[in-house]
Amino acid sequence: MTRYIFVTGGVVSSLGKGIASASLAAILEARGLKVTMLKLDPYINVDPGTMSPFQHGEVFVTHDGAETDLDLGHYERFIRTTMTQNNNFTTGRVYEHVLRKERRGDYLGATIQVIPHITDEIKRRIIKGAGDADVALVEIGGTVGDIESQPFLEAIRQLRFEVGARRAMLMHLTLVPYIATAGETKTKPTQHSVKELRSIGLQPDVLVCRSDHPIDISSRRKIAQFTNVEERAVIALEDADTIYKIPGILHSQGLDDFVVERFGLQCGGADLSEWDKVVDAKLNPEHEVTIAMVGKYMELLDAYKSLIEAMSHAGITNRTKVNLRYIDSEDIENQGTGLLEGVDAILVPGGFGLRGVEGKITAVQFARENKVPYLGICLGMQVAVIEFARNVLGWKDANSTEFDRTSAHAVVGLITEWEDATGAVETRTESSDLGGTMRLGAQDCQLEAGSLVHDCYRKDVIVERHRHRYEVNNNLLPQLIEAGLKISGRSGDGALVEVVEAPDHPWFVACQFHPEFTSTPRDGHPLFSGFVKAALAQHQKNS
């Protein structure tokens, strides 16, 4: 039977519940247990698919096409379990389902209330998401005390009681601030946070205390005394120079032993040698490169969380320190390509909308004409095709219908007809709902033998995840190919362009899919690894 570890946060947000949870999951997995993770988001949006990147950060796409919280990206990077649509749900999703049942008459005229109807639905989804895992870690978003999270906390209180203490425990993350003028860490915020939890019927079993300074044994003993938590279960988690140290830090304090003993699990010891290798490669690089990342959401780098991590993973696999130079594409429009001088490679990620697109196109032109290694992802591929059409083929008005519906040379356009899972044709237009109307999830891609991308993957068919509405216009494809654009990847049925490469260029690859969603620190990703190798070659050439 599945054991549950519920993870909450207190005092302030952004303490790193996702990283701490994923790190504990990684240790339990290293002990031979089957582990899964869930993220429960208290906001009322149905999913984060239509939320602003400046507010929410990245939308992580699962293998089965769910648009989810970026924490699921952390989960997949730390454990081998593949996340699905069942591993993340929101208040909006829960209420939507309950209201749909009410409209159908499933509740037989009952008055619909938060308790029991909403909490029952939350519990049902937790159990479904946990599946047949030995241990399921369930992270509740937000901070204890937020009004939005109350139904979730009540649901886990009920579920904890229903399954019993041998199958459920609560891990609470808090902040232990360091007061410089006093020269000591303060435990009072943690005490009050636990008091808040206990007021709603939740007693934590484990406290993970975050701090930017060491937490001495006397402070941990004081926290244990005032919170009714065993002293061995008060874990000090100081800021680390890489998040991939966290599994080792938690293991060194015996957190996994505490969990295994509490649940009565039979398993072996933790083999963290893979993580030791990751940390060593991360902290002891042999080379260094600088790569320009030209995007439009640079005010909140969490909008590119998986991509930034994927570049770090590529650095790990190549024993290379990857310095990312973050450049807003609008700055290129205003200040020119001088911002790109001296970099070893250029990366253009995905995005939506007209703002900053011309700056991205200019960055592509700079990379192509100056033979600088280039990797384009999603919109980064679409602007590569637009730039090629404008400056090689001579179609100066070439564009995407996303940005200019009147262009005579719309080399990128909206797919207007899709088949749903039943085979029925669904028609979409520019005015269709934004939510849930994209090409989403894992898709097959056929690679052209002898291409750069094939050299990276060393496979004829790959599977990568998508999140987009627009595709290269097949009606104009013959002219693009005739002008030299190389189509090195196509969809499984051969109908859609997935990867393009520029002619007469040392390394220029642009893909419609999002490879960053499948990159991990232990395995890296072949496309990003190849990109960093190309940047290394460029760096050595320029040295």
UniProtKB/Swiss-Prot annotation:
GO-annotated biological processes: 'de novo' CTP biosynthetic process; pyrimidine nucleobase biosynthetic process
GO cellular component, one term: cytosol
The Glutamine amidotransferase type-1 domain, residue ranges: 290-541
Binding-site list for UTP: 13, 186-191, 222
rRNA-binding keyword on record: no
Subunit structure: Homotetramer.
Name by which UniProt lists this protein: CTP synthase
Organism field: Pseudomonas syringae pv. tomato (strain ATCC BAA-871 / DC3000)
UniProt gene name: pyrG
